[in-house]
C-alpha cells in the first residue's frame, strides 16, 4: 500500500513537468522607432548576412519581411549570423498577441517596432515604455517565413 501511494504521488508531481507542450517564458519588451522604418536596411542589423542572415534569406529591408512591422531585436540573437536570426516568437501582453521576427540583438528581452508594441498595448507603447510579456518560439510560418 505504501508503495502504491508513493508511486501515485511521484507520478502526479513528475508528469506535469514532462509534458510535450512548450511553456511560455517571460521577458521585458521595449520599443525602438528605427524598426518602424520599412526602408531600414538589414545590412545594419545583427542578422544581416551569413548563412543565417535575413539578406541571405532574400530580405534587404525591414519592410520586405512578411510580418513587418512585427520585427525587432531579441535577446536570443547574441551575435552576427546567430542561428536564432529569423526565428519567430509568439509574444503576448494582456491577451494581445503578435508574431515577432527576430532580426537584431537586444541586450534585454525584446526591442521591437513601436507600431508592434502599440498593437500589444492598445496604443500605449510610449506611455508604458517597457513591459513584461510572455513569449515562446513558434514555427517560422506563423511569421510568414518559409
Swiss-Prot record:
Superkingdom assignment: Eukaryota
Chain segments annotated as transmembrane: none
UniProt entry keywords in alphabetical sequence: Glycoprotein, Secreted, Signal
Entry's localization field: Secreted
GO cellular component: extracellular region
SUPFAM superfamilies: Barwin-like endoglucanases
Chief localisation class: secreted
First and last residue of the signal peptide: 1-20
Post-translational modification as stated in the protein's UniProt record: Glycosylated.
Gene3D superfamilies in alphabetical order: RlpA-like domain
Alphabetical list of InterPro entries matching this protein: Cerato-platanin, RlpA-like_sf
Stated family: Belongs to the cerato-platanin family.
Protein name listed in UniProt: Heat-stable 19 kDa antigen
UniProt organism field: Coccidioides posadasii (strain RMSCC 757 / Silveira)
Amino acid at each position: 500500500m505504501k508503495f502504491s501511494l508513493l508511486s501515485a504521488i511521484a507520478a502526479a508531481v513528475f508528469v506535469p513537468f514532462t509534458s510535450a507542450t512548450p511553456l511560455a517564458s517571460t521577458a521585458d519588451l521595449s520599443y525602438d522607432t528605427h524598426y518602424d522604418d520599412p526602408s531600414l536596411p538589414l545590412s545594419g542589423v545583427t542578422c544581416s548576412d551569413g548563412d543565417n542572415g535575413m539578406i541571405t534569406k532574400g530580405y534587404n529591408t525591414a519592410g520586405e519581411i512578411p510580418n513587418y512591422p512585427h520585427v525587432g531585436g531579441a535577446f536570443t540573437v547574441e551575435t552576427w549570423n546567430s542561428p536564432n536570426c529569423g526565428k519567430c516568437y509568439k509574444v503576448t501582453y494582456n491577451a494581445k498577441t503578435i508574431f515577432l521576427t527576430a532580426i537584431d540583438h537586444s541586450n534585454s528581452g525584446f526591442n521591437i517596432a513601436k507600431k508592434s508594441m502599440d498593437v500589444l498595448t492598445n496604443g500605449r507603447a510610449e506611455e508604458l515604455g517597457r513591459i513584461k510579456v510572455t513569449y515562446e518560439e513558434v514555427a517560422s510560418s506563423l511569421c510568414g517565413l518559409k
